[in-house]
């Protein structure tokens, strides 16, 4: 598990819970990359004995130059989608109802905001998050358009 960072304790616990052992990168047959913000460093940690590399999030674009056919590369695709979709829906509802203004207000006034019900919703990207948010929007009877490549 490299490089050293604030996620280490949680990742070590997950590896051990799954029956694995955490050892030095030079001894390991697998590498769990723990620093999504430092893709440029991964090459310096890769070793010939690594037959599997786990990347930290769904998108692999920052690591594209490091990918090879010598080892199995996996990522977090689908892991975060349900939680991100739920959070996105919460943010849309907060925005539509102007909750930030009401949270600071000291008195009730005429409501400002709009309904999500029946709204036209455009989703940019058709990946896992889009797939998970669409069912969450269905009860609101939205007209949904997904734009993808």
Question: Model-predicted segments: where are they?
Answer:
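N-terminal glycine-/charge-rich "phosphate-binding" loop or analogous flexible N-terminal tail
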Residues: 1-30, 37
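Rossmann-fold NAD(P)-dependent oxidoreductase module
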Residues: 14, 87, 91, 132, ...
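Short secondary-structure boundary/capping segments
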Residues: 23, 64-65, 112-114
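Phosphate/diphosphate ligand-binding glycine-rich loop within oxidoreductases
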Residues: 30-104
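Rossmann-like dinucleotide/phosphate-binding beta-alpha-beta segment
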Residues: 112-149
